[in-house]
């Protein structure tokens, strides 16, 4: 199952640097950014915890399985990148 990973852009990293960090963690870029400074990545549900372990400087908080988009909830992971 493929989920979307919503990551708030870090003030300390450029978008290019952040994308490289996510790719290093094995996460493929799905959409570059949204109006809310959130970058959206595609991630396989079964790989999620392995991706977290493999990431170097990426820390995820407030991990949830459902994210409300408009009036509907979608399967997703939500993380804040520091």
Please provide the spans of the model-predicted regions.
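Positively charged, small/polar-rich N-terminal and surface patches that mediate targeting and assembly
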Residues: 1-82
